[in-house]
A protein has these predicted regions:
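Protein kinase catalytic-loop region centered on the HRD/HxD motif
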Residues: 198-208
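Activation-segment/catalytic-loop signature of the eukaryotic protein kinase fold
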Residues: 155
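AlphaC helix of the eukaryotic protein kinase fold
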Residues: 117-143
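Activation segment signature within eukaryotic-like protein kinase domains
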Residues: 192-193
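Conserved short submotifs of the Hanks-type protein kinase catalytic core
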Residues: 159-173, 177
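C-terminal lobe helix-coil module of Hanks-type protein kinase domains
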Residues: 200, 219, 251-354
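Protein kinase glycine-rich loop
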Residues: 88-95, 99
Length: 356
């Protein structure tokens, strides 16, 4: 009867809104079979058929792949949405999901949207714990306002995807300048790391530890000389968390000894990671290299890194001193704050400019 068809039609709209296009198609087909002239059901059916052929999102059991990927085509069908954001294009793939360029249709603001299909990586109580931690930390990170920290606008969940909407930045991540053939001039590298140290000082004073500082998590716009630290609030998931496949997420090469040991970390762990980043950006080499994770963990915990002047004899001795202090195994002998590290870098940069 008409009331049943109306209920089914509304169910189809609900599936469409949730991007469960195959289910919407099945419902609208049923309505068409019983009343081809019902409302705009013919157009809805056609639209959802087109969309279901073009887009795959999240863990939709009747579609593949199921890794939280949107397949975006350039045909004339309506663009997919995550939360309130329209997805425009793909920016890249992160450790746990995709990053998209999107916009907020209400205010027209462009945003980068990082998605994570947490249910693909964790299960049961662990999944609930990770989700709670993710939302708590992302909301805390959203309260950070600093010229060298990427602004987080929104965090949410849509179907099986958790997402963070953040400022869309021009520039490249620092990995572009961490290879021996594409290093920045030393003074410019110091300017970049000073900005990052000041950003971390601010975050640590706000009781936020990043836990995944590395070149890939800093975006540098060389045209205006500004670097921004990104992925605050995401790193809580990569803090040596093991997924259900047993994989350790995160970047062990940049982790402090205490982080690799699974101990509670504070801001000084981030400063160790920033020291590793500085070393790599001055030499194109990581300070600790090994053939296996176990061997790498042993080296970071117990062995001294090669003196940076083995690679860069042109640099003044203060560079070695800054690196050695940042990479000290003992917490109390490391830089105690981002501000302290920034000041040491600025002093050393002045000696650098006298030398060159």
């Amino acid at each position: 009867d008409a009331s049943l068809l109306n209920q089914l039609y509304n169910l189809g709209l609900d599936y469409e809104r949730k991007r469960q296009y195959n289910k919407a198609v099945a419902v609208f087909k049923y309505v068409v079979a019983h009343d081809p002239g019902f409302s705009d059901v013919q157009e809805r059916l056609q639209h959802n058929r087109e969309v279901s052929e073009q887009f795959v999102l999240g863990n939709n059991k009747s579609s593949t792949p199921s890794d939280g990927t949107l397949i975006i085509s350039n045909s004339g069908v309506q663009k997919p949405m995550i939360g309130r954001y329209v997805i425009d294009s793909e920016l890249g793939r992160g450790a746990m999901g995709m990053v998209y360029l999107g916009h907020d249709p209400k205010i027209g603001r462009s945003v980068a949207i990082k998605t994570m299909s947490l249910s693909q990586e964790f299960e049961g109580d662990k999944l609930a714990d990770v989700k709670e931690r993710f939302f708590r930390e992302a909301e805390t990170a959203g309260r950070l306002h600093h010229p060298n920290i990427v602004t987080i606008f929104d965090v949410g969940e849509d179907q099986d995807l958790s997402y963070i909407a953040m400022d869309y930045l021009k520039g490249e991540n620092l990995m572009a300048y961490a290879k021996s053939e594409s290093l920045l001039p030393a003074q410019e590298t110091f300017d970049v790391i000073v900005q990052a140290a000041e950003a971390l000082d601010y975050a640590h004073n706000e009781k936020v530890v990043h836990r995944d500082i590395k070149p890939a998590n800093m975006i540098y716009d060389r045209d205006n000389g500004i670097v921004k630290v990104t992925d605050f609030g995401v790193a809580c998931l990569t803090d040596t968390s093991k997924t259900k496949t047993g994989t350790i997420l995160g970047s062990p090469s940049y982790m402090s000894p205490e982080q690799l040991a699974g101990a509670k970390v504070d801001g000084r762990s981030d400063l160790f990671s920033l020291g590793v980043t500085l070393y790599q950006m001055l030499t194109g080499e990581l300070p600790f290299i090994a053939d296996s994770l176990a061997s790498l963990m042993y080296k970071i915990a117990n062995e001294k890194h090669p003196d940076i002047r083995m690679f860069r004899p042109d640099l003044p001795s203060c560079v070695s001193q800054v690196i050695n202090k940042a990479l000290h195994k003992e917490l109390d002998r490391r830089f105690q704050s981002g501000s302290q590290m920034a000041k040491a870098l600025i002093r050393c940069r002045e000696r650098l400019s006298k030398k060159h």
